[in-house]
A protein has these predicted regions:
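Nonpolar helix-loop interface/hinge motif
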Residues: 4-68, 188-275
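Membrane-interface elements of multi-pass transporters and channels
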Residues: 65-74, 113-121, 152, 156-171, ...
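Membrane-embedded alpha-helical bundles of multi-pass transporters/translocases
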Residues: 33, 37, 47, 134-146, ...
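Perimembrane loop-to-helix junctions flanking transmembrane segments
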Residues: 70-85
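Selective recognition of hydrophobic, aromatic-rich stretches within alpha-helical transmembrane segments
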Residues: 2-19, 85-124, 169-213, 245, ...
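Hydrophobic alpha-helical transmembrane segments in multi-pass membrane proteins
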Residues: 48-68, 88-104, 140-167, 176-193, ...
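Juxtamembrane transition segments at transmembrane-helix termini in multipass membrane proteins
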Residues: 2-7, 192-205, 232-364
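Membrane-interface alpha-helices at helix entry/exit sites of multi-pass transporters
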Residues: 127, 139-143, 215, 228-231
Length: 364
């Protein structure tokens, strides 16, 4: 039943994207909400996703051409094969790092979209860009910090292995260092990534510094690490299925039919172009899904840990009134001709004191 000023008394009736309740969400609701967010705002989400995916995949393809283009045309010998395997491993790691950075950047851009849906505010096609644009520098810095911390933990754990190999130590020591270092490094990398991933939505919505967003992510993740890990793991499985089996196979088939037996620079460039196009298409679809899950995880943690949904409902007023900063049961002092600015939406999410805006009469 509708409550005062538009809030619904039924906690399950008001939703994020007309399918996800405005309350703490289950894992299935988080995944469904990310998909529904893409369907409801396809032009906004897919437009941002195509831009990010194109940069990532073109960069990967250019690196692939310069890393293995010559080796692919050479006669296959043990040395060439070893160099090719090393290049493939390097390209795989580079692709994973770039993809993870793209997901983090997209999560920061998706946060205002889903945040406005959460409080029932309209979203213009370029609204997400206007919300995130003032924070692009810190968003990129936060994404780099999350990836840097995760990869740094992996590097520190495997450093003894490579140091022993470089020092030509006894093989047994290298084997022991590898058996201990690689699992430990991978575990630390995953643990830190999941612990810090919510810093990306926080730096955009809460207007925090990079270090402040990282501390905020640690606070929000307390006691819910395994829940976050399980949710992101399921999202990864969906991504692999949609991105490879459903979307990449047609392009791989075209690549095999037209360039499978061909040789020469033209065939190499053609096969690489088709493969790049396939990766752009597949990543443009799955990237906003992964990013939406991260953004919704942040909002879920705000509601579970801090009662963000209950805080807004307890004020007994609409989102517009909350943004305007008017008294709980009085109309907002906003002039009819003054539109609600982007900073008003951000004020909903900030946890620090908000400066007063003269036209509302709101107190800091």
């Amino acid at each position: 039943m509708p409550g005062p000023d538009g809030w619904d008394d039924d906690a399950g009736a008001t939703d994020v994207v007309r399918g996800v309740p405005f309350r703490p969400m289950s894992i299935s609701e988080l995944l469904d909400g990310a998909i529904a967010g893409i369907r409801r705002r396809p032009r906004t989400t897919l437009g941002l996703s195509v831009a990010i995916s194109t940069v990532i995949q073109v960069t990967s393809s250019v690196a692939a051409y310069f890393f293995i283009g010559d080796e692919a045309r050479d006669e296959v010998t043990p040395d060439v094969l070893l160099e090719s395997l090393g290049a493939q491993l390097t390209l795989t790691v580079l692709g994973l790092v770039l993809s993870a950075c793209g997901i983090l950047l997209m999560a920061g851009l998706m946060a205002p979209i889903l945040g406005r849906e959460l409080v029932g505010m309209p979203i213009a096609p370029r609204q997400a860009w206007r919300d995130a644009r003032p924070r692009l520098g810190r968003l990129a810095g936060t994404a780099a910090a999350v990836m840097g911390a995760s990869l740094g933990a992996l590097a520190l754990a495997v450093l003894p292995f490579f140091a022993l190999i470089a020092a030509d130590a006894h093989p047994a020591f290298g084997v022991i260092a590898g058996l201990l270092g690689f699992p430990l490094g991978i575990g630390l990398m995953v643990w830190l990534y999941i612990l810090l991933v919510q810093a990306v939505p926080a730096v955009v919505l809460e207007r925090r510094t990079v270090t402040g967003a990282l501390r905020r992510a640690v606070t929000l993740s307390k006691g819910r690490w395994f829940h976050t890990c399980g949710t992101l793991l399921l999202a990864l499985l969906v991504t692999v299925f949609m991105g490879f089996f459903a979307l990449r196979i047609p392009f791989l088939f075209v690549q095999l039919v037209f360039f499978g037996d061909a040789s020469g620079d033209g065939a190499t460039m053609g096969a690489l172009a088709v493969d790049t196009l396939g990766r752009i298409v597949s990543w443009s679809v799955v990237l906003p899904f992964d990013a939406g899950v991260i953004a919704l995880l942040y909002m879920d943690r705000r509601m579970r840990r801090e009662g963000f949904d209950l805080e807004l409902r307890s004020r007994g007023r609409s989102a517009a009134a909350v943004i305007a900063g008017g008294p709980a049961h009085e109309p907002a002092a906003e002039p009819a001709h003054e539109p609600i600015g982007e900073d008003g939406f951000i004020d909903l999410w900030r946890t620090d004191p908000v400066p007063a805006r003269p036209w509302t009469g709101a107190n800091p």
